[in-house]
Amino acid sequence: MGSLPLILLSLLLPGALANVYSCAGSVKSTSPVDYSQLKLQVRLLTLEGHMKHEEEVNPSNGYFMIPVYNKGHYTLKVSAPAGYYFEPDSIEIKIDGKTDACSLNEDLVFHLTGFSVRGTVDGAAAGLPLVLTENGKQIAETKTEDGGKYEMRAPPGKYEVSTGAGASECISKGKTSVEVKNAPVVVTPNFKISGYQLEVHTRTESMNPFVDAVMTLYATSSIDLPNIKCVGSEGSLNVPSTHNVKCSIGKTDPRGRLSVACVPSGEYYLAASHVNGPKSINFSPNPQKVVVSQAASEARFVAQSATGRVRVTSKDLPLSGVEVLVNEKSGGKTDSQGYLKIENLKEDEHTTITAKAPNTQFSTVHANVKFPKVEIQDVTVQKFDICGQVEKSENGVLGKLTFTRKDDKRSLEIQPKADGSFCQPVSPGLFTIEPTDKTSSLTPRLLEVEVLKNAVTNLRFTHFKTNANVHLSCIGACPTATVSLFLPGQTLVRSVKGTDVFTFENIGPGTYSARLDDNGRGCWEKSEMTLVVEQSNTQPTIHFKQNGFAAQIEISHPAEIEWSNADKKQLNGKTSTKGGEVISICVPTSGVYDVSLGSCYKFERQQFKLTVPFDGVHKEKAVAARISGTIDLENDKNAAVSIRIKSSAGDREIQVPALDNGRFTFEEPLASSGEQLVIVPSSKLRLFEPTSKSVTVTGKCIENAVKFNSFRGIFLDGSIKPAVEKAVVKAVLKKDKDVVIEAISNKDGAFKIGPVKRVEDYDITATLDGFKFTPTSTPGHFQSVKLSQLSIKVVDEVTNAPLDGVLLSLVGGKGAGSDYRSNNVLDETAHKNYVALAPGEYFVRAILQEYKFSPSTSTIVVKEGQHENVVLKGKRVSFSAYGKMREMSGDAMKDVIIEALSEGCDLHQSEATTKEDGTYRIRGLLPDCEYQVHAKSYADGSPAPHSFPRSFTVSMTAEDVKGLEFMATITAKTTDIAVEIGMDTLPEIQSVRVVITKNNNDHVQVASVVAPQHLHYLVNLPRDGVEYAIRVEAEKPPQAFAAKTVRVVADQAMKVARVPLTSSKRANDVDISVGTFLSLPFFVTLALVFFNQNRVLELLGTFIDWARNTFAPTADNHHRKRK
């Protein structure tokens, strides 16, 4: 049996000392919660869920502290009455004695984040969704259970409970308000079902969903539904007059559906519609009767036809009064905007649309109907007729006419009919018409004809001609001007240049418009007049009269323009410009005028002289824009406020006039557009809100760009009582922690802070070593306390012997030390001294495994400057089990976890780790409980070694149990290395030397490998992670290959190292080449068996003996009992 440990060998790890670790923290809440009434507990659980320890939180501040005696994985959870919720729900801890929160004395914090909101919906089945909302935002959701019961969780606040999305039923009033403060809430009274869901479906005849159908519900009375507005109605087609309330309930979604919740029981009429401007869809059946009663209802609509409209245009201009043909039948006439409504359009049907008008040809379009889309292109004019009459000459000849398009200069020659009439269809546009024969006496000689909105049918070319005269009446000499003559429709006949008299020769009869253009030099009573030419011997004459002189001015930005005659100031006037435009100013006489610009912009010249008349355009350009702001000075005449303007060009300062109640202005160059300015007000007496503001320069004037409020600052006279000198007092602005005001108290404890706006805006603190300062109800005033001392000793109540290893927790309660907290493990003296304590109430708790202290928490009152002495006594209430684990050889086994588990005592569990000498002590075992004690695992989590016996059954009494000794069988962990040498690549090599070292220098082995053998083995090496260097070199000169070295780490059961050989003369180390045992499945296994024949036979025999002992009935499960 001496070979048994070779089969069951396990990993040995260093042992851990039995230290005690403090897992401390607090249960915090933003709402005032009475922990003493709740009796909150924090539980320490193993990963299997076994409870290791349970501790009540401090009733004053929620603090807790739990001792942990063994390293390992644990879970902390808060145990509380139903309806209280904490985050996190649990905290996972791996105690390693170094890096975990408990070992580092870091706080473990649970936050009481919410409470239950529960209630009942009478008459509701299970599955009704409910939501909890705050200001419209969803906080929680749930579904009712059997009986209509529900429960949600929420932090303190004011909420509303209502049905959630997908609910087919609604509760009474739709929602109810609840307020969560510091405890679970029961919603009363119970909800009742008040309505049901209405489902609407819309589709096309081709079974596709119809989107955005508008649904209107007609009822006999107004219904109270969220987000639905009901108004009185005079009824609708096919809706009974009794249903005179109209409610818009929404639109269908992309699936063609609309769900309306909470519709009360009753009889309704539902109508569907879809209107997109002039386009609409007709549904069937529409409307339809809907009865809501005891369950969700539904209505279905089918989109059957559409109504659209067509527009008739010519060159994008609307044509009114035009008859429209739909499928060759009259559909009506267009309105003033060229539109006509077309009804009963079917989806996917072929519908043609065109128009009809005299002397006009139109395009034909097709209606494209694909619900809900209805598209009809404009019907456009293709041809207009130009018609007229040509008078015969004296010898009876009818002259031809030439039509020329103005846009592309294409021309067409027209021959009138025998009666002189002509009618030519042309595409819309502008044309010139003139006699083809340049020597012909036909007039007019040239006509400009516009055919954009209608045909032209009244043109007349005649051989009659006469002259027309235009006279100018000027102030002084008339300037050179141009008079143009137009026919109706803006057809230019002729333009004539001159000064005071303009003659238009050889023009035909008709009504003309004469327009005067003098290049803007003069002002005229009329610049356009009507000229009528009749077929008579009298030459028509008209007169244009000048009433002033004009000057052209262009100002770059908006401004008011004022002018006055330099010699006669009574001749003055004003006008305005929006900037960037050329305007004319009219003055009564010529001469020199003074012009000034009034604007928020600064110009290159704000005033200038202008000589009238003036050829050309006078221009002025703005160079800066005004920015203004205000500071509310509260009518303070002595404010002495200045403004600092910070920019990339530097800082500049301006004074704020107090008489204008804080209004200030400054000018910023237009070139600074896009720059950010920072405006900072300052004063020795006043404070400002905000302290600064930014303005972006836009290149435009900015009125009231910034506004500051100001107020006189106040100074706080603070105090410390009893007086403490040289205390440091800091006032930190709550909104900006960088704003700090400091002061030092004098010998009377007085100090001054300021100027400030409101003391309440600052957090004020006082500090000095050896003192504690508590703010009073009056800001800036403190109560000072000289700190005190407390000594605590912990002893056994029977023997009065000091109890070392006690975890002592001291927590502040009421008074100046309410935020104090300290945890300490007592040494062999069992004594702890606390210094510099603030006077007040403290809670002290002593914790030692197997001991109970009564009361569990003691209250100690520490008085100012006093030294308090306290003795705590503990009574032993649980006991230990002692034992040892050793190998069959007698060697101690360390770092094995021994566990004691009691199924009969609520799965109470405790464990310990074996020490260097293999001993262990399992603490905290309860009397009258029966435990199973067994090896659980190694401390690193690897499986425990096999032991004899497998377990002990221990019935605990009020005494320790000793002598629980385990004998373990272990298997040593080793590594075998197979070295494969690439000798086949160099057949001339007959033998090589293998040199093996570790840790770079330590010699391990030197061996020769002779061909044809090319494998070498190292067996039973310790699996300890050591790196081995394997060097293969030529055994005899001459050297046919360069020596090779590979490195292997002993960290697995089997490692294979390959060493390739080449004829290269260069020395070279190669990288690790490591495979697994499977890479050489046959020859490596065979070689191992060959080289270890005795060991294999011994292992096989040991395994057979072990199997017989294990499966034969034996008494290896010993029972130990102490009474």
UniProtKB/Swiss-Prot annotation:
Cytoplasmic face residues: 1093-1123
TM annotation in the entry: 1072-1092
Pfam families, per the entry: Ig_NOMO (PF23141), NOMO1-like_1st (PF22898), NOMO1-like_9th (PF22902)
Compartment(s): Endoplasmic reticulum membrane
Lumenal face of the membrane: 19-1071
Keyword Signal among UniProt keywords: yes
InterPro entries linked: NOMO-like_N, NOMO1-like_9th, NOMO_7th, SDr/BOS_complex
A single BP term in Gene Ontology: protein-containing complex assembly
Principal localisation: endoplasmic reticulum
Domain of life of the source: Eukaryota
GO cellular component, one term: endoplasmic reticulum membrane
Keyword Metal-binding on entry: no
Membrane topology: Single-pass type I membrane protein
Tissues expressed in: Expressed in body wall, pharyngeal, uterine and vulval muscles, motor neurons, nerve ring, motor and ventral cord neurons, hypodermal cells in the tail, vulval epithelium and intestine.
Signal peptide: 1-18
Keywords in alphabetical order: Endoplasmic reticulum, Membrane, Signal, Transmembrane, Transmembrane helix
Function according to Swiss-Prot or TrEMBL: Involved in the recognition and selection of protein complexes to exit the endoplasmic reticulum (ER). In muscles, regulates levamisole-sensitive nicotinic acetylcholine receptor (L-AChR) subunit composition, possibly by allowing only specific L-AChR subunit combinations to exit the ER. Specifically, may promote the inclusion of alpha subunit unc-38 into and the exclusion of unc-29 from L-AChR. Regulates L-AChR sensitivity to agonists such as nicotine and levamisole at neuro-muscular junctions.
Subunit structure and binding partners: May interact with nra-2 in the ER.
Annotated protein name in UniProt: Nicotinic receptor-associated protein 4
Originating gene: nra-4
